[in-house]
Design a protein with these regions (language model features):
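Per-blade loop-tip surfaces of WD-repeat and WD-like beta-propellers in eukaryotic adaptors/scaffolds
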Residues: 130-133, 154-156, 193, 198-229, ...
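Canonical WD40 repeat/beta-propeller blade segments in eukaryotic WD-repeat proteins
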Residues: 87-94, 171-178, 236-244, 283-291, ...
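Structural signature of WD-repeat beta-propeller blades
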Residues: 79, 88-91, 174-177, 185, ...
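Beta-propeller domains
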Residues: 21-91, 95-166, 194-225, 267-271, ...
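Blade-level signature of beta-propeller repeat domains, shared across WD40, Kelch, NHL, RCC1
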Residues: 438-465
Length: 465
């Protein structure tokens, strides 16, 4: 049913099992028979085979003498970052460094919101990640001896850099989204205290680029902390649904746990006018919102009520729901992503299923694609901005899965016995983080993904995409 078709390189699992076995050396007597020598050679070959790393699949039990090692040859780039308090949500900020950047070292800007131990300790973080070099190592490099001095100097030069600017934020940041608007960069934040606020983060982005500006900003913010451009307190409960319209600058949609969705529009006073009449249709918490990538009045939402709804904001709020996929998942629907180039929406739920919906037959047909790999609720899903058949999903099973829906199984392909039950569309499994909450593809850095988890951030690019 998919319009895409192309060949794709073999899928890769970057984690491998390494067996930590003792080496047994037996000295042979000079009078050993030829058959004994042959037996010894066979045993040595068998032990060598046992000691070779094997591909690891999630939930595969490890023996006492086994541990996991990351295969660096599966990554073009892999970096980790810590922010102190973990971040439930973040967004990648578009910059002026150019599109389609592939030359290392790379630079990325993000805005994130913390989940601190106390509501008054939370911050919005404006972050610059720079000097991001390739970390690729061929398999044979692992066994080569280090040229210590040269390598240490080179490693020091290639250390990634991270620079922060902080904005104090009342309450945990449930979700945060950034947009460019009138020569400024704005961030909308959903607070656990029930407020949705819009911040101008242009000054902070300039500060992380210039040490002198950052020092001045930090001093000024002690007595004169940044204030939001606008704060909306009309939601009756906290929420998670939040998205800027990509085709109508400054327009925002926010959805709460009470089931209400409000549409924001910028006004001439430099703030926002929020329609106090919520969109009517859902019967439970709004979990995610996605505006159409090409129709400025159309958006999609998903909910704990297990429906996905398509809305037209030109209609009256009680008539704005135009299409509904009932019982789209067996449990709560957590996340959706609208493909930027094709009429498809991907959804992920508490049931661990990843569904793909064709908007041309949305209400009357089942999903055109269903994939079951995650063993726990899916927490994030996003289509690739460049390759329309590629998407990424993250789950509470501590996995990030990369998919190419254009791939079909080749009947003549030789498949490892351990991999034969995996969907052929599954390209790559990224692990190493605990409690992954959100992922985003970088629009300007092809193939680069940023993820946030309880254990911090990862920014990586695989050999598969």
């Amino acid at each position: 049913t998919f319009v895409w078709a192309r060949a794709r390189a073999s899928r890769v699992s970057p984690y491998k099992i390494l067996i930590m076995s003792e080496m047994h050396i037996e000295s042979m007597a000079s009078g050993s028979s030829e058959s004994e020598n042959e037996d010894m050679e066979e045993r040595e070959e068998s032990e060598e085979d046992d000691d070779r790393p094997r591909i690891y699949l999630p939930d595969q039990p490890l023996k006492e003498d086994e541990h996991l090692v990351c295969d660096q040859s599966a990554y073009v780039m892999l970096h980790q970052a810590q922010t102190g308090a973990p971040c439930l949500s973040f967004d990648i900020v578009m910059d002026n460094l150019g599109n389609d950047r592939k030359e290392f070292p790379l630079t990325s800007y993000i805005v994130a919101g913390t989940q601190a131990s106390s509501p008054h300790l939370n911050n919005i973080l404006i972050v610059k990640m720079s000097n991001l070099h390739s970390t690729y190592k061929a398999l044979e490099d692992d066994d080569s001896s280090d040229e210590d001095d040269d390598d240490e100097e080179e490693d020091e030069e290639k250390k990634p850099q991270m620079t922060f600017a902080f904005i104090k934020h009342q309450g945990c940041v449930n979700r945060i989204r950034a947009t460019n608007f009138k020569n400024s960069v704005l961030a909308a934040s959903w607070s656990e205290l029930g407020r949705v606020e819009v911040w101008n983060i242009t000054q902070q982005l300039q500060a992380v680029d210039e040490p002198a500006l950052l020092e001045r900003y930090n001093l000024d913010s002690v007595n004169n902390p940044a204030k939001p451009l606008y704060s909306f307190t009309g939601h009756q409960q906290e929420g998670f649904g939040l998205d800027w319209c990509p085709t109508e600058p400054g327009v925002l949609a926010s959805g709460d746990c009470r089931r209400d969705i409000h549409i924001w529009k910028p006004n001439e006073a430099g703030t926002w006018t929020v329609d106090q009449r919520p969109l009517v249709g859902h019967t439970a918490s709004i979990e995610d919102i996605q505006w159409s990538p090409n129709e400025r009045n159309v958006l999609a939402t998903c909910s704990v009520d297990r429906t996905i709804r398509i809305w037209d904001t030109r209609a009256a709020p009680h008539k704005a729901c135009m299409l509904t996929a009932e019982n789209a998942h067996e449990k709560d629907i957590n996340v959706i992503s609208w493909n930027s180039k094709e009429p498809f929406i991907a959804s992920g739920g508490d049931d661990g299923f990843l569904h793909v919906w064709d908007l041309r037959q949305f209400s009357r047909s089942p999903p055109v694609g269903t994939f079951k790999h995650h063993t726990a609720p899916i927490t994030s899903v996003e289509w690739n901005w460049i390759e329309p058949s590629v998407l990424a999903s993250a789950g509470e099973d501590n996995q990030v899965a990369l998919w190419d829906l254009a791939v079909e199984r080749d009947d003549n392909e030789r498949i490892d016995e351990d991999l034969k039950n995996l969907p052929p569309q599954l390209l790559f499994i990224h692990q190493g983080q605990n409690d992954i909450k959100e992922l985003h593809w970088h629009k300007q850095l092809p193939g680069v993904i940023v993820t946030t988890a309880h254990t911090g951030f990862n920014i990586f690019k695989t050999i598969s995409v």
